Each structure stands twice: as structure tokens, then as C-alpha cells.
Amino acid sequence: MSADESNIICIEDDEENIEESGVKYSDKLPVCQGSSKILCRSSSQEVIQENERKKRGKNYAVPSILDDFFGVYCLLSRSPNRYFKNRCYIGYTVNPNRRIRQHNAGKEFGGAKKTDHRGPWDMVCIIHGFPNSVSALRFEWAWQNPEKSRRLRLLNLKKRTSETAFGFRLRIACHMLNSDPWRRLSLTFRWLLPELEIPFPLDVLPPSHIAVEHGAVTKISTLIPQLQEEYDVAGTCSLCLKPILSISELLRCHANETCKSHFHMRCLSKHALNAVDEYRTSLFPIQGQCPKCGVVYLWGDLIRDQRILLAVNKFNSSSTLFNMIPRGKLIKM
């Protein structure tokens, strides 16, 4: 094994229990690293809904659903053994706080074979915001195997002499974020341990629409509205004026507290792609502008909102609220 190869573990997919978003009642996952949390601004509608819940009684449990989380992370070994120290491991998770504990606890506690007895490990960064687990797992595999990925192999990415193992992995990730199909996703690059942060390569910075954040990941839940007046019908598409028959084909304007427009997914995608002359070359836009109110949105944010609407509708499947659309912005906690 060469010196370069000794610093990078050839990673195989590790087995992990994939959690599905289910209904929970106001519970949060413990934060393993740091204390930074994702905060949400309150609106007048949120204050009204909060007051309504207080009126129903202090012991009233408001049902909620866990928002989807699909992330691909990079670990860095702090092993006292110089043979393992500073090696990197790339993995996929739906719960980074739990996953780092598993890696450091060992294989018998759910950690991966390639990290067993080679730590302790630090989870330095994670890229999240993927629309589904398949998309995240494909990103994980390409990050692990850039020389095999048809999206990256032509770049012939090699570790530079002055480059650390993590620096090389960061450069690969930046190339991926600038390559199809990942450059079209509204992802977040999160530094979990800011003290280990290093500058992005100047020749391949992340795209401007990729958010760069710091601090630990906090699982977010969405409260499910319980009142009939908090819902509306799907109605008609604001572009083609035809009925929207299913929530699976519905997208809401990002400014849904003030703009009540609903769209067919295909209609809004076509509108945004035509605006940048990409309709014949792309399936969906990176971002767009609401044709009614003019607010700028990221396509990935609308898809995440749609997934939450589908989960809310599944919860309401046995009630009169089935196939109804929540009004305004949903409350996060």
C-alpha cells in the first residue's frame, strides 16, 4: 500500500437501520456535538396556533411528524496509532448524532467494520438536504469512489502531495457539488466541528445556492394542524388553471403565508426552466420565481415542503382533513 493510499480508507457501504418519518409527539433527539440548533422564526399565524393549543389544555399532546433527513458525512480519525490517524471515512446516515456514537462505540454497537478499533472518530462535516435516501446513497458512493463514478472519473482527481486526506475528500465533495446531478439540488454543507474547518478549494468553490452552515444537526419536527379552518382545498393550478387532483403533484409557493398559489409540479417546473432556457436540457430547475408573487425559491425547498404535506395527509387519512392542504407555513420545533 502506498503512502497516499494509507491515508484513505476504501469504504464499503455500512449497514444502518433506515428510519422512516413517523408520527411522534414533541420529542427531540439528543445533540451529541456542539449546541447549535436550527431555529425557526415565529409568525403571527404561529402565535395564533400556539394560543389555540394553550386553550385546549396544558396536557394536550400536539401530534407531529419528523422531517426527513438524509445526510452524507466525513469522519476523521484521531487514533493514537499513526497508521490510522487522520484517515477519512465517508458514510450515509439519517441521524448523525446517533451515528457518530455508533462509530466510536464499535462494530458490536452498530458501528462500521472499517471504523472499528481505528478511532476515536470526529464527524467533521455533513452534506444534507437530499430529496430521498437513494439520492444521498448515490452521492455517498461517488464520494467514496470518484475514480469509478461516471460523473467524476474524467476529472482524474488525485491526492496532491501537500494535501491531507481530509483536504482531498473536501476537494472531491466540492467537485461533486459543481457536477450534475448534485449541482441542481438545494443542499447544505454543514461544518459539525468548526475548529476542524478548513477553507474550500479556491478553484472549485461550492455553488452559490448551496448553504454553508455550522454546528450540530438538530432533528426538526413539524406540528400537524388540528383545526378545519387551518386547511384548504388543493384547488386549481395557478398556471394552467386545471384542477390539482393529488397532493403528490402539488407544489405551494414558498411565501405560503402571503401567497396562496398552488401549482402542478410539471407546470411550475416548466415555467422556471423556460425562464432560463433549460426546458429541453433539464428535468427540474435549480431555482425559480413564483409567477404570482415574484418570490424567489429553491426547487429543493418546494419538494421538501411537498413531502411534509404528503406525510401530514397520511396522518389525516382517517379524518375529514384527508386530501386537504394546510394553510400557511407549518410550525417547526
From Swiss-Prot:
Residues passing through the membrane, by range: none
The name this protein goes by in its record: Structure-specific endonuclease subunit SLX1 homolog
Cysteine pairs bridged by disulfides in the record: none
Superkingdom: Eukaryota
Assembly behavior: Forms a heterodimer with a member of the SLX4 family.
InterPro entries: GIY-YIG_endonuc (IPR000305), GIY-YIG_endonuc_sf (IPR035901), Slx1 (IPR027520), SLX1_C (IPR048749), SLX1_endonuclease (IPR050381), Znf_RING/FYVE/PHD (IPR013083)
E.C. code: 3.1.-.-
Cofactor: a divalent metal cation
Source species taxonomy: Eukaryota, Metazoa, Ecdysozoa, Nematoda, Chromadorea
